[in-house]
């Protein structure tokens, strides 16, 4: 997978540069340059034209956020942020994603050399996946941002036409008590935010989001979605309950199960059971328990990500009578999870990211007769 990948490693710590470079080299990745700060990283990218950059967040002269912004403006290259596991770094890491970084990998605390060695396979796999991203082609954000409160338009008419206020032929209305389960991994945070920004509150969805992300970051991620969408979104806690117009983000290092469902409200349970598909939280866990528990309309959505997590969950949702959607290859940062889901034969619709919110709405509307 890593054969032929060329990387620049940027970190102000000589020790960390050496550890990261050795891990990548042992994994078959050619480290063409190392950089001590953001300015050196920008110069190295322009000179060497690598396939990927691993970028520390806090560096002298120019930090990782500024360097990422410069790289995207001057020589667009996939950037993987390497962030310390702190609340402060969570904030700046998400800022780097806003500037164009594809994803992030958390550097361990404690005995770094031992921990990095333990995580070496994950790091090599993630660097290789990020290197394959076409940063100029994926993740369009048209129709988001300042337009986040605007109801999207679909083939059945605008969402404002679906509120059931009219009875003329051709109008549609939302089904009662729909639930949406979203799963994503590499490259997913921006994609999830885009989908959520474009879901109208009138749809009254219950939304469960599983993004492969460590502790310390999922809370910040939930806050960002809450700010940018019309839905009330928070990080899941054990026993949390939500109804229409509300959402939960699975907490880092915890599986999120749907424990029970009654009268349009669902309750979640968090566990530290063994990782599923080598990850925790796992999309499959939430989708499978949702399919078993929820007896109202259910939609499963798989966005960009590496691996196969979510494929079995999509199968379970389809078998339970739910609707299923996967992101297309052209707009996925990494076409792993959506591909595996589609290969099950249980995906109803494959859509580009800009059409997914509309696609979700199409699954939860019905024509008024």
Curated annotation (Swiss-Prot):
- Listed GO molecular functions? phosphorelay response regulator activity; protein-glutamate methylesterase activity; protein-glutamine glutaminase activity
Q: Taking every annotated instance into account, which residue ranges of this chain make up the domain Response regulatory? A: 6-122
Q: What GO terms in the biological process aspect are recorded for it?
A: chemotaxis
Q: What does its PTM field state?
A: Phosphorylated by CheA. Phosphorylation of the N-terminal regulatory domain activates the methylesterase activity.
Q: InterPro entries, from UniProt?
A: CheB-like, CheB_C, CheY-like_superfamily, Sig_transdc_resp-reg_Me-estase, Sig_transdc_resp-reg_receiver
Superkingdom of the source?
Archaea
The record ties this protein, via Gene3D superfamilies, to:
3.40.50.2300, Methylesterase CheB, C-terminal domain
Catalyzed chemical reaction(s): [protein]-L-glutamate 5-O-methyl ester + H2O = L-glutamyl-[protein] + methanol + H(+); L-glutaminyl-[protein] + H2O = L-glutamyl-[protein] + NH4(+)
The record places the active site at: 185, 212, 309
Compositional bias annotation for Low complexity = 138-159
Q: Which UniProt keywords apply?
A: Chemotaxis, Cytoplasm, Hydrolase, Phosphoprotein
Compartments reported by the entry:
Cytoplasm
Enzyme Commission designation = 3.1.1.61, 3.5.1.44
Instruction: Provide the top EC class.
Output: hydrolase
* UniProt cross-references to PROSITE patterns, sorted A to Z: CHEB, RESPONSE_REGULATORY
**PTM-bearing positions, type 4-aspartylphosphate:** 56
Region (Disordered) residue spans: 136-178
Its domain comment says: Contains a C-terminal catalytic domain, and an N-terminal region which modulates catalytic activity.
What the protein does? Answer: Involved in chemotaxis. Part of a chemotaxis signal transduction system that modulates chemotaxis in response to various stimuli. Catalyzes the demethylation of specific methylglutamate residues introduced into the chemoreceptors (methyl-accepting chemotaxis proteins or MCP) by CheR. Also mediates the irreversible deamidation of specific glutamine residues to glutamic acid.
**Protein name (record):** Protein-glutamate methylesterase/protein-glutamine glutaminase
Gene symbol? cheB
């Amino acid at each position: 997978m890593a054969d032929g990948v060329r990387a620049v490693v940027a970190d102000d710590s000589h020790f960390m540069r050496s550890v990261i470079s050795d891990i990548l080299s042992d994994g078959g990745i050619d480290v063409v340059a190392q950089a001590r700060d953001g300015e050196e990283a920008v110069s190295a990218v322009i000179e060497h034209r690598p396939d990927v950059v691993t970028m520390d967040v806090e560096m002298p002269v120019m930090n990782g956020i500024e360097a990422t912004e410069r790289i995207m403006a001057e020589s667009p290259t996939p950037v993987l942020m390497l962030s310390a596991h702190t609340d402060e770094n969570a904030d700046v890491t998400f800022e780097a994603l806003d500037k164009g970084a594809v994803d992030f990998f958390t550097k361990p605390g404690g005995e770094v050399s031992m921990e990095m060695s333990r995580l070496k396979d994950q790091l090599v796999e993630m660097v290789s996946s990020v290197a394959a991203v076409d940063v100029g082609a994926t993740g369009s954000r048209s129709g988001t941002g300042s337009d986040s409160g605007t109801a999207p338009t679909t083939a059945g008419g605008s969402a404002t036409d679906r509120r059931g206020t009219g009875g003329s032929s051709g109008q549609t209305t939302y089904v009662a008590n729909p639930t949406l389960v979203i799963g994503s991994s590499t490259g997913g945070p921006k994609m999830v935010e885009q989908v959520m920004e474009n879901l109208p509150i009138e749809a009254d969805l219950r939304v469960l989001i599983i993004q492969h992300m460590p502790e310390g970051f999922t809370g910040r991620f939930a806050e960002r979605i809450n700010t940018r969408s019309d839905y009330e979104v928070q990080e899941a806690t054990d026993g949390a309950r939500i109804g229409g117009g509300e959402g939960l983000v699975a907490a880092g290092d915890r599986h999120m199960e749907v424990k029970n469902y009654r009268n349009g409200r669902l309750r979640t349970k968090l566990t530290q059971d063994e990782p599923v598909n080598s990850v925790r939280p796992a999309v499959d866990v939430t989708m499978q328990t949702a399919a078993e528990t929820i007896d109202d309309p259910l939609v499963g959505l798989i966005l960009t990500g590496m691996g196969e997590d979510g494929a079995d969950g999509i199968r379970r949702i389809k078998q339970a009578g739910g609707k299923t959607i996967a992101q297309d290859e052209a707009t996925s940062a990494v076409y792993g999870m959506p591909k595996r889901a589609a290969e099950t034969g249980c995906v109803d619709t494959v859509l580009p990211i800009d059409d997914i919110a509309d696609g979700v709405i199409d699954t939860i509307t019905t024509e008024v007769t």
